[in-house]
Amino acid sequence: MARLFGTDGVRGIANYDLTPQLAFELGRAGAYVLTHGTHRPKVVVGKDSRISGDMLECALTAGLTSVGAEVISVGIIPTPAVAYLTRLYQADAGVMISASHNPVEYNGIKFFDKDGYKLPDEVEDRIENIIKEKIELPSPIGTGIGTRKEYTNSHRDYIEFLKSTIDGDLKEMKIVIDCAYGASSTIAPILFKELGAEVILHGAEPIGEKINVNCGSTHPEKLQQLVIENGADIGLAFDGDADRLIAVDEKGNVVDGDHIMAICAIDLKKKGRLKNNTVVATVMSNIGFEIALKEQGINLIRTKVGDRYVLEEMTKGGYSIGGEQSGHIIFLDDNTTGDGEITALKLCSISKESGKKLSELAACMITYPQVLINAKVKNELKNAYLEDEEIKREIENLEREMRGEGRVLIRPSGTEPLVRVMVEGKDYDKISQMAKELAELIERKLN
C-alpha cells in the first residue's frame, strides 16, 4: 500500500482515492495521535469551496467525534485561517479539507498541530500506521462521544487578525482581486474593502464547480486583463485555499513569488525586521532572485521543493520570511503557514507606503532565462549522477563558466524514470546548449 501522506497532507480524487471511509479513518486516527489520547480534545475543521467538501467534512467529523473530540466547524475559509484559529481557540489540532490549486475533482485533508504547524513526517507516519495496521482505538459511548459546533464568528476573527499584520490602510488604492471561486471569497472582498481600497472582484463566490478553473494564481490571464481595463494599481490572485498569492502589476505583468519575496525582504531589511538578514526559498527560486538579494546584502538559504521544508528551515534558524516561486510565502512573525492574504496585504502596504507602483518595486529583480530538459534514465539509476565523477565535473565546469550569473540544478523525478536538468543564466541560447549537452551526458552515463 502506497504512503497516504504526500508533501501536503492526504490528497487524491474525491470519492475515488479520498473516500468518505478514508476521511472517517483519518479523523479517528488523527484526533487520537494529535491529542495524545486526551479524553475531550478540541479540533478546528475548515474547508475550501469544492463540492466534495461537505461529504468529506461529514465523514471526517464522524471520525473525530467517534473518539470523543469536540469539533469546531469554521466553514469555507482559507487554509492559513485554520492554522491561526487553532491557536486562537486553544484547540488541540486543526484540519483543513482542500486540494489547494488542484482541479475540482481533487480534494485533500491536511492536519495542523495545536500551534498551527503542519505535521512532521514522523507524526503523519503514526497516523498512517494506525489506519494501515487497523489498530483499535477507544470508542466512547454516551456522554463520551464528541459533538460538533459551528463557530459563526470565525471569519470575523480571521479578518481582524489579518488587519493587524500591517500598519495603516489601503485607501486610494484600486485593487483587482481574483478569488478563484475558492476559500478567499469569504475573506478577501470584505478585508480589502474595510481597509479602504476600491475593489474589483473576479471569481469571488465560493462556487465549488468553478474552483481554480481558468482563474486564480495558476491562471492569471483574466486578472491581467481586468487590471489593464480598470486602470488598477495592482491585481491579486489567490488559489483555491488562499495559501498562495500571485500578483499582477499596473501594466498587466505577472509578479511571481520570487519577486514578491524580494520586495518584502528588502522592505523588512529597511525596517530592521529581517531576522538574521536571511530569506529561505527552495531550489526552484530563480538565480535572479538570489542575485537581487545578494546586491542588498541579504543571505539566501535554499531547501528542497515544498513549503513544509521552507518552514522547517525557518523555524530552525528563526527567520522571518521564506517561500516558493509559486507564491506560497510564509511570514513567520504573523502565521505558521503560507498565507495569501497576509502576503497580499504586505505587498499592497509596501506599494502605498513607498509611493511606488508595483512594476517599480518588482524591478528590484530580473528573472534570468531558464531551460529545463528531461534526461531519460533507468528508474533505479536516477540518483547515480551524484556518484558519477564525469557528471559532477561537467556541472562544476558549467557553473564556473557562468561566474555566479547562472546555475545548474539536477533533480530526479519522483514519479518517472527521468532526471530533470535545469540551467539558468543570462544567455538563453548558451544555457540551452549547456542543458542539452549535460542531459545527453547523463543519459549516456546512466543507461
UniProtKB/Swiss-Prot annotation:
InterPro entries cross-referenced by the UniProt entry: A-D-PHexomutase_a/b/a-I, A-D-PHexomutase_a/b/a-I/II/III, A-D-PHexomutase_a/b/a-II, A-D-PHexomutase_a/b/a-III, A-D-PHexomutase_C, A-D-PHexomutase_C_sf, A-D-PHexomutase_CS, Alpha-D-phosphohexomutase_SF
Coiled-coil residues are: none
| PROSITE patterns linked to this entry | PGM_PMM
Q: Which UniProt keywords apply?
A: Isomerase, Magnesium, Metal-binding, Phosphoprotein
Biological role = Catalyzes the conversion of glucosamine-6-phosphate to glucosamine-1-phosphate.
The UniProt entry's sequence similarity note says: Belongs to the phosphohexose mutase family.
Give the protein's recorded name. Answer: Phosphoglucosamine mutase
Protein's organism: Thermoanaerobacter pseudethanolicus (strain ATCC 33223 / 39E) (Clostridium thermohydrosulfuricum)
Q: Gene that codes for this? A: glmM
